[in-house]
Amino acid sequence: MRIGYGEDSHRLEEGRPLYLCGLLIPSPVGALAHSDGDAALHALTDALLSAYGLGDIGLLFPDTDPRWRGERSEVFLREALRLVEARGAKLLQASLVLTLDRPKLGPHRKALVDSLSRLLRLPQDRIGLTFKTSEGLAPSHVQARAVVLLDG
């Protein structure tokens, strides 16, 4: 058994798209990032990589490489899954905490879990998804923290 932890955050700006868990979320603000800025998938990618000492998303997909400009974060997550599965790992469970003040994510919970289930190839009862706000301490950012449990 192995456990991995990942974390990511991005500044939010007016007029940018907000991607979370692979979905475009209706929002007046979105992530300022080199890729699509999906903090949720970035944290999950880092969690998978950390479980096997494979570095992090910045090592595999550096923001200095123009190939990754605007890239969908699903590409990064799929590669991290491929790398751990090549080592005989099976993803058993994922837990994710998303912190942002706006927009409220409650109305999108089902769609977000559906997307994570599809991307991670896990049943929905093996995915934990928690929403938090910064209580006004950091209203212009999104943060994601992820923990994964793998067998192998």
Swiss-Prot record:
The record marks 34, 133 as: Transition state stabilizer. This is 2-C-methyl-D-erythritol 2,4-cyclodiphosphate synthase. It comes from Thermus thermophilus (strain ATCC 27634 / DSM 579 / HB8). PANTHER family: 2-C-METHYL-D-ERYTHRITOL 2,4-CYCLODIPHOSPHATE SYNTHASE, CHLOROPLASTIC (PTHR43181:SF1). Pathway: Isoprenoid biosynthesis; isopentenyl diphosphate biosynthesis via DXP pathway; isopentenyl diphosphate from 1-deoxy-D-xylulose 5-phosphate: step 4/6. Involved in the biosynthesis of isopentenyl diphosphate (IPP) and dimethylallyl diphosphate (DMAPP), two major building blocks of isoprenoid compounds. Catalyzes the conversion of 4-diphosphocytidyl-2-C-methyl-D-erythritol 2-phosphate (CDP-ME2P) to 2-C-methyl-D-erythritol 2,4-cyclodiphosphate (ME-CPP) with a corresponding release of cytidine 5-monophosphate (CMP). It catalyses: 4-CDP-2-C-methyl-D-erythritol 2-phosphate = 2-C-methyl-D-erythritol 2,4-cyclic diphosphate + CMP. GO terms for biological process: isopentenyl diphosphate biosynthetic process, methylerythritol 4-phosphate pathway; terpenoid biosynthetic process. Transmembrane segments: none annotated. GO terms for molecular function: 2-C-methyl-D-erythritol 2,4-cyclodiphosphate synthase activity; metal ion binding. Disulfide bonds: none annotated. Its cofactor is a divalent metal cation. Belongs to the IspF family. A divalent metal cation binds at residues 8, 10, 42. 4-CDP-2-C-methyl-D-erythritol 2-phosphate binds at residues 8-10, 34-35, 56-58, 61-65, 100-106, 131-135. Homotrimer.
